[in-house]
């Protein structure tokens, strides 16, 4: 009996002829898992830079390589990549492909010219529900979706500062999130990013005061102002101009979690920075008090969406990459 990959290859040959693997060395490919999808989930990938938006490749379910039951069957641009995909499948020796597998094919010349690689664009795909396949593990976030009825394109942006300045973040998005299914573990690992950002912000502010040649007394006073985690996360949100208003789903999550422990004024004035911090406190200090086991998946899924939004923020990248050069202390 033919396995999944062999069935696709057999059908592919009937549709496109024998695969030509000679052109494969001009392209890079990556496999992703996405559990809930439609066969029509075929997207052109565009590399988004400060100056332009360039078509870099295609992303589609592996299953469409052996099918004509989709909208792109007669698209000449897709056909080129479908034939390349057939060659990739023919030479691929792994046994980790399944009906949930999607393939991203990028033209090497384009990604080299614009420095667009999976390693520095992972967030742009994760937020749509495409997780790297890690040791066969698969995770599905019901909030990470993209509707092919609304768009046929996915734009990817590079975030090199994130990879080079905080190694934990690429490890989180490329390895930990794809294979970890426990929502509590996911939340804790996601919140670590905000703790890292708070640490970065703290040192950024201290270096800023030093650059201004502030006195030690002034610096001590400023350190005291930055001593609490609540003030630090407020500082991160303000400095990076992150979204602070909450949507109705986030407000509903807060009400489901805290109930009557918080009054109407709290829910009415709730900001995102406070929601994140308060959820963290509830989990760390009062896990036994709230019905967190029933809410943890919703909490983790929404925190993941917020995390991706944070990592795509240009001010976050700037915070990670830049800080004033240290100056000698003025002891007077």
At which residue positions do the language-model features occur?
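Charged, non-catalytic interaction/linker regions at domain boundaries
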Residues: 1-182, 196, 297-301, 305-332
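Amphipathic, oligomerization/interface secondary-structure segments
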Residues: 152-332
């Amino acid at each position: 009996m033919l396995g999944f990959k062999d069935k696709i290859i057999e059908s592919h040959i009937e549709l496109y002829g024998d695969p030509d693997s000679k052109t494969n060395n001009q392209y890079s490919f990556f496999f992703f898992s996405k559990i809930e999808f439609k066969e029509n989930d075929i997207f052109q990938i565009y590399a988004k830079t400060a100056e332009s938006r360039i078509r870099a490749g295609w992303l589609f379910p592996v299953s469409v390589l052996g099918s004509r039951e989709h909208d792109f069957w007669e698209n000449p641009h897709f056909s080129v990549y479908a034939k390349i995909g057939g060659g990739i499948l023919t030479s691929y020796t792994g046994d980790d492909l399944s009906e949930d597998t999607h393939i991203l094919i990028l033209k090497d010349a384009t990604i080299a010219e614009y420095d667009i690689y999976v390693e520095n664009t992972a967030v742009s795909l994760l937020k749509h529900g495409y997780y790297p396949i890690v040791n066969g593990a698969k995770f599905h976030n019901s909030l990470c979706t993209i509707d092919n009825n609304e768009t046929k394109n996915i734009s990817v942006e590079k975030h090199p500062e994130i990879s080079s300045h905080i190694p934990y973040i690429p490890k989180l998005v490329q390895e930990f999130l794809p294979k970890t299914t426990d929502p509590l573990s996911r939340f804790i690992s996601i919140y670590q990013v905000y703790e890292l950002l708070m640490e970065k912000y703290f040192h950024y502010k201290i270096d800023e005061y030093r650059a201004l040649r502030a006195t030690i007394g002034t610096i001590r006073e400023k350190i005291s102002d930055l001593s609490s985690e609540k003030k630090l996360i407020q500082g991160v949100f303000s400095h990076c101009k992150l979204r602070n208003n909450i949507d109705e789903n986030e407000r509903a999550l807060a009400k489901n979690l805290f109930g009557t422990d918080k009054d109407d004024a709290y829910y009415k004035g709730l900001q995102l920075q406070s929601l994140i911090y308060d959820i963290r406190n509830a989990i760390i200090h009062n896990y036994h008090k709230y019905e967190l086991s029933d809410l943890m998946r919703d909490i983790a899924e929404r925190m993941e969406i917020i995390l991706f939004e944070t990592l795509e923020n240009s001010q976050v990248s700037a915070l990670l990459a830049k800080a004033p050069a240290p100056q000698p202390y003025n002891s007077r």
